[in-house]
Amino acid sequence: MVNVPKTRKTYCKGKACRKHSQHKVTQYKAGKASLYAQGKRRYDRKQSGFGGQTKQIFHKKAKTTKKVVLRLECMSCKTKTQLALKRCKHFELGGEKKQKGQALQF
């Protein structure tokens, strides 16, 4: 389980800052795929009409997790950067901090 705080003080590459400043942390989420990208237009054209499936569908998935990507937004200059973490099964943003000597909570 990875628990990341909602704010973090880190270096900002923005032209206005170029120093360590407070950043707002969110989890990156992929946008919706465009219908007008060249590959999608070609695929749809090829699929239309008779003849069934024209390109192979990938089935041999090897990975069980995805790498978590953090989106860091500088609170002073609003510059956004992305930071990739290691793979993990459980990711939590802004969860409760663990206390020393406490009983495990399930």
UniProtKB/Swiss-Prot annotation:
The keyword Ribonucleoprotein applies. Keywords: Antibiotic resistance, Cycloheximide resistance, Ribonucleoprotein, Ribosomal protein. It comes from the Eukaryota. GO terms for molecular function: structural constituent of ribosome. GO terms for biological process: response to antibiotic; response to cycloheximide; translation. One of its GO terms (cellular component) is ribonucleoprotein complex. It holds the Pfam family Ribosomal_L44. Confers resistance to cycloheximide, an inhibitor of polypeptide elongation. Belongs to the eukaryotic ribosomal protein eL42 family. This is Large ribosomal subunit protein eL42. The gene is RPL44.
